């Protein structure tokens, strides 16, 4: 028996540090099941599958704003390293794909954009693939309390902040529902926590969904965003085509 990251480092001919990072990023699986613990003891002949990570791509750019497609498994904070001179305006969870906006730091437009977020004048639309059948549009209004340690975790609590999510079913197949999701507030993990709250967790959500899944990622995609006269759309990856 040997620690998983050490076996992976030999298989991929990479350092132990890189092997740990791949596992921690959710990119390594065994027999279709995601490996969650880098130090897990496994047989030395274990074979891993390592998922490749796409690079971010430009959707739109002008003197004010840069709209990017963020693939899953890239930290939002790392996007600025790909595009020098731009500052991150908002963020998506690591495994969430979709449109992310950057602006010129401390520019006049940057200040206006930050105010738009603060005033809830930004319209966002997501796609989520969830467990179970949801047949009607509904509003989920449940306060969310977030704990921030090494990793953020949120839950429904009367002590939490107001959180409102609107879901609309787009397609139902094999006891799964593809949802259009709108949010009136922007709490940490809001969509993920609200969908768990109504017993329809997002497929592939290893934090809030205990059901096993063959999905290689969290099935949540930031589809559209609009603010200050701009509107952008990131086409959903093929895994959302059910």
From Swiss-Prot:
- InterPro entries, A to Z: PsdUridine_synth_cat_dom_sf (IPR020103), PsdUridine_synth_RluA-like_CS (IPR006224), PsdUridine_synth_RsuA/RluA (IPR006145), RluA_PseudoU_synthase (IPR050188)
Q: Catalytic site residues?
A: 93
Q: What is the designated name of this protein?
A: Uncharacterized RNA pseudouridine synthase HP_0956
Its Enzyme Commission number(s) read 5.4.99.-
State the signal peptide span: none
Which Pfam families does the UniProt record give? PseudoU_synth_2
PROSITE patterns under this entry? PSI_RLU, S4
Keyword annotations from UniProtKB, A to Z: Isomerase, RNA-binding
Q: Where is the S4 RNA-binding domain?
A: 2-62
Q: From what superkingdom does this record's organism come?
A: Bacteria
Q: Which reaction does it catalyse?
A: a uridine in RNA = a pseudouridine in RNA
Report the family membership. Belongs to the pseudouridine synthase RluA family.
Give any GO molecular function from the UniProt entry: pseudouridine synthase activity
Example GO BP:
enzyme-directed rRNA pseudouridine synthesis
